[in-house]
Amino acid sequence: MIRAAFACLAATVVVAGWWTPPAWAIGPPVVDAAAQPPSGDPGPVAPMEQRGACSVSGVIPGTDPGVPTPSQTMLNLPAAWQFSRGEGQLVAIIDTGVQPGPRLPNVDAGGDFVESTDGLTDCDGHGTLVAGIVAGQPGNDGFSGVAPAARLLSIRAMSTKFSPRTSGGDPQLAQATLDVAVLAGAIVHAADLGAKVINVSTITCLPADRMVDQAALGAAIRYAAVDKDAVIVAAAGNTGASGSVSASCDSNPLTDLSRPDDPRNWAGVTSVSIPSWWQPYVLSVASLTSAGQPSKFSMPGPWVGIAAPGENIASVSNSGDGALANGLPDAHQKLVALSGTSYAAGYVSGVAALVRSRYPGLNATEVVRRLTATAHRGARESSNIVGAGNLDAVAALTWQLPAEPGGGAAPAKPVADPPVPAPKDTTPRNVAFAGAAALSVLVGLTAATVAIARRRREPTE
């Protein structure tokens, strides 16, 4: 009886909030003030070797990628184009490269960190698909990119068909170290070439207790977002197989109500998505189904900022002939439907280009605020699943936000660091939790005392 009472008391104390975070508990990353952005000169960071044949995206039998998909319809692009088509914007696609063609004619060469090409090649098909979502040209069918008047900058930063010639140590950490170094250089290069929207749809995931040095990456991200005023959009990550080239990530626990001071549950993170976790400089994008619900594979995390369509996508093939595609070949060369946060990020980057074109006076932080403030909110507060809510292109282009009395058309303001949200006043909730904890402890102690008293009164057997 006494043991049961104290066991109940111990459980009550844990539930009441006396919780010790794991040794690897993390928080939002902090940019090292002493770190310098790396050189953005393209070129392989390590000698690479092609290990597999190139993949070409195609059309799944019995389907027509020219028919507007539910994902495209969800954004109501014809209505959005009444206000902006992305004129005057340069969007960098840091991915597997982009193959120009009739549906992607406005692509600038941004260089290659895999081989020594100009970046206008795509051995995986992924980068071209993302580019088509951002700025693919309309044709005699129902497909169009979000911002068809924008220009694209192709920077080839990775390929699943290539790997380092030599590797040593832990292969996961070695690959992650290489990926982080390449991404840092690619982001600096994109910013230096004038991209005002930078899309990163290839991500790296690591366990929270097995991280690699990201000082240079943090400096590069801050340099692009603050010094160069670029909106950086990144895929949140996928927790299962999908039509994407990024490796599968592990999921994260959602909000823990026992820790009211950590509403986004940074302390509970077990898997980190790079570069998405670099808050507040990166807008991380989760995936939605065609019905507007969170995709099952979309990786949750405290960095998720917004959600966009990411399932059963259609876009432009890397075949080079302007054909559309809705599938990528799997390991058995069977075409698999295109789904992933990679493509969701492309939709957000496209809308960011529309907003920057319509409101040239907004800096990068204000553009991100406009995207998140006009999203369809699934909850009153940002969640680890969909962030601020579902992307709304028309609202982002038309709503007048309280802080923008002039509709955002004022002259550009000096760019400052994105503000870190002020700590929420959780005093009332903390008091409630403390009161509940104290009451629970009192009840537990009373139960234990009563049990001891009864034990003393009972005859000894």
From Swiss-Prot:
Signal peptide location: 1-25
Active site: 95 (charge relay system), 126 (charge relay system), 342 (charge relay system)
Every Peptidase S8 domain range: 64-397
InterPro entries the UniProt entry points to: Peptidase_S8/S53_dom, Peptidase_S8/S53_dom_sf, Peptidase_S8_His-AS, Peptidase_S8_subtilisin-rel, T7SS_pept_S8A_mycosin
One function term, GO molecular function aspect: serine-type endopeptidase activity
Gene Ontology process terms (BP): protein processing
EC number: 3.4.21.-
SUPFAM superfamilies referenced in this protein's UniProt entry, alphabetically: Subtilisin-like (SSF52743)
Uppermost EC category: hydrolase
Annotated localization: Cell membrane
Induction comment: Constitutively expressed during growth in culture.
Family according to the record: Belongs to the peptidase S8 family.
Matches recorded under NCBIfam families: T7SS_mycosin (TIGR03921)
Descriptive protein name: Mycosin-3
Protein species of origin: Mycobacterium tuberculosis (strain ATCC 25618 / H37Rv)
